[in-house]
């Protein structure tokens, strides 16, 4: 055996044995896999697609839902080509209309004339996802402006049965259950006291691998805005004690930046729409976000330790509109061009500094922590070794799953990353240098 390898292995073993155990929260394997997805697609689809409303009234006739050419495989193929790893569908929005034949509701596709009452959007989408290797997720709003039980103790049991009909296996594995915290009045003018422990327990019983979204998790949290940006500082940890989803939760700042001393691992999910609204409208076909705007969102979400959930709403045909799909392909092409060539060479660690060779010009730095050991880095500096010596390029804060630092255009033979503040011994799992000639 090579002596150098033996010595290096012995040194690593000694370091591992002497390193103080990390005392902060750690992610579950499911949370690590979730954040590795980096980009998923949101599909807002339902009666609002046909009315132009964002929040339906719950009194819409079931026949209003009538997509003329539903093609969930087109959604999935589009998502896959754009680099998305999963799709979340609004199976039931606040209006109560169910995109599947929910046995405890009379406001579903079963009561519509679409496909003679035999249609099931969730079946079509889950099967398409399975065929293409894309993960399937669901948004099921507990608010129901149609169900007569809403606002009574019985409704919580009705909602559990709703969850069971989706999560019980008929549609296969569900990677994320999205709970909107909205809680308005039902048809009887009453509000509901949601039994969140019961709802969460139902999800975990039926889909134990699923990530549960809400403003306080427990799987992932809302980023605190719908504009598409996580905080420049963004911890994957959050203080959730004493909070209830949708009711006086953490401050917008805590949601956006996390809590350095957070007691639970609840990483941020950045949800934003490719259009001004969440549901499709013909009047917004000329307002789809530009590639420049989408790149900004990418850098400020994925590049700031968050997963990006980009809403791309199907139209009244039941298809992703050509304007949206074309823009997504342009966005994908831009990302592929930017990150095609990593000019970072060998890296050498000395204490809390890493020096990496630079094999060409660059203006983007990608850093990743080994988050299985926890999020540790609180601040770091970036320097480049040029003909004039070492020059500071950036001073930044957290890293987490991924941090993309936008640097000035630089030509250097080496880059040094120095962690200046951390909760414990820092561990970087990846260092990359790239040239972006697209984003301005």
Predicted segments, located by residue:
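Mature catalytic domains of secreted/periplasmic carbohydrate-active enzymes
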Residues: 18-409, 418-437
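Extracellular Ig-like/FN3 beta-sandwich strand-entry sites
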Residues: 412-414
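Conserved catalytic region of serine esterases and O-acyltransferases that act on ester linkages
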Residues: 440
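Sec-dependent signal peptide recognition
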Residues: 2-8
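Hydrophobic h-region of N-terminal signal peptides that target proteins for export
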Residues: 10-17
């Amino acid at each position: 055996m090579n002596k150098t390898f033996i010595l290096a292995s012995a040194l690593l073993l000694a370091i591992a044995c002497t390193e103080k155990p990390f005392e902060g929260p750690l992610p579950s394997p499911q949370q690590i896999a979730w954040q590795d997805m980096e980009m998923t697609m949101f599909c807002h689809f339902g009666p609002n697609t046909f009315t132009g409303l964002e929040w339906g009234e719950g009194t819409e006739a079931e026949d209003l839902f009538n997509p003329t050419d539903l093609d969930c495989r087109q959604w999935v193929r589009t998502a896959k080509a754009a680099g998305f790893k999963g799709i979340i569908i609004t199976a039931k929005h606040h209006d109560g209309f169910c995109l599947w034949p929910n046995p405890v509701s009379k406001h579903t596709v079963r009561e519509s004339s679409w496909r003679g009452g035999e249609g099931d959007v969730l079946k079509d989408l889950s099967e398409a996802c399975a065929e293409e290797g894309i993960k399937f997720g669901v948004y099921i709003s507990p608010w129901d402006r149609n169900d007569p039980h809403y606002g009574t103790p019985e409704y919580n049991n009705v909602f559990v049965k709703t969850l069971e009909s989706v999560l019980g296996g008929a549609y296969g594995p569900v990677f994320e259950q999205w709970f909107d915290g909205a809680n308005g009045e039902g048809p009887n003018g009453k509000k509901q006291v949601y039994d969140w422990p019961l709802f969460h327990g139902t999800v975990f019983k039926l889909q134990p691998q699923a990530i549960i979204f809400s403003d306080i998790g427990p799987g992932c949290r809302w980023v605190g805005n719908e504009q598409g940006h996580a905080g420049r500082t963004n911890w994957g940890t959050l203080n959730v004690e004493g909070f209830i989803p949708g009711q006086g939760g953490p401050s917008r700042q805590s949601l956006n930046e996390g809590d350095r001393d957070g007691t639970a691992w609840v990483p941020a999910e950045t949800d934003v729409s490719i259009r001004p609204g969440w549901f499709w409208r013909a009047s917004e076909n000329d307002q789809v976000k530009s590639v420049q705007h989408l790149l900004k969102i990418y850098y400020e979400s994925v590049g700031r330790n968050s997963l990006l959930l980009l809403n791309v709403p199907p139209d009244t045909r039941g298809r992703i509109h050509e304007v949206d799909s074309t823009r997504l392909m342009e966005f994908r092409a831009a990302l592929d061009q930017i990150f095609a060539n990593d000019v970072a060479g060998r890296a050498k660690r000395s204490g809390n500094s890493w020096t990496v060779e630079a094999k060409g010009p660059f203006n983007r730095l990608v850093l990743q922590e080994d988050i299985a050991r926890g999020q540790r880095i609180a601040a770091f500096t970036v320097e480049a070794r040029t003909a004039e010596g070492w020059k500071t390029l950036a001073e930044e804060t957290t890293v987490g799953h991924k941090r993309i630092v936008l640097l000035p255009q630089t030509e250097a033979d080496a880059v040094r990353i120095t962690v200046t503040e951390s909760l414990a011994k820092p561990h970087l799992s990846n260092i990359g240098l790239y040239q972006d000639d697209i984003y301005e």
